[in-house]
Amino acid sequence: MHGLPVMHLVRVTGGRYVEHDVHRPEVPLGDPVPFTRTAPDRPSRPAVVGADLAAAVAPVTGTAAAAMLAAFEQVRARLDTTAAQSGSPDRAVLRLGRAAVDAAVRRCEQGGTLDDLASAELIALLRSDEVRDFAYLRTDGSDVWHLRLWLGLTRRAIPGYVAGPACLAGYVAWRTHRPELARLAVHRALSDDPGHALAAILLQLLDESVPPELAELLLAHHRPDSGMEPPMQ
């Protein structure tokens, strides 16, 4: 991920993990530590799952899809204008993205939902790695609305914009011990963007059955309450 300082470098293989020197990646810091896998090893492709589970990441159709397409057209035009008028388009996108993420988090915390325009704007801004990383730092998976937010945006995203919200949905599903749902979301992300780095990392964690508790330990230093935020570029 871009813009985040590397605090820990961990290699996971064969049910063991070992931390490496950040500045000298070839140097391990201690012996490999075994961990308890959360589930039996699974193939990279998700197995046959229930219709309800598959529907949780399936794209919307009909009038809902048409409404989102119209919303995206409005949002893209507005974002293009904003970027063109800004002396630093990347900085403008990051500023808008942070505001959109914070607004979505506040609204969902209060039990609300995002309308089509707000959804389209956030989804479009998540194409920025820096905005996606900011959203990732804001997502801890402690409440059901985290999963509901990112799954909803995954379903409403148009082709070419799915990877960001789908990857975040997969992350929250993994963190909340829903590996099959996480796998479906990650594969939606990779189908939309085969080179998506964070989705590839999540798929590896799922394939290794790495427990999400280990991720929390490693990610604790990157949380917003630790004072470490992705820098404005």
Report the location of each language-model feature:
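Charged, compositionally biased boundary regions
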Residues: 1-233
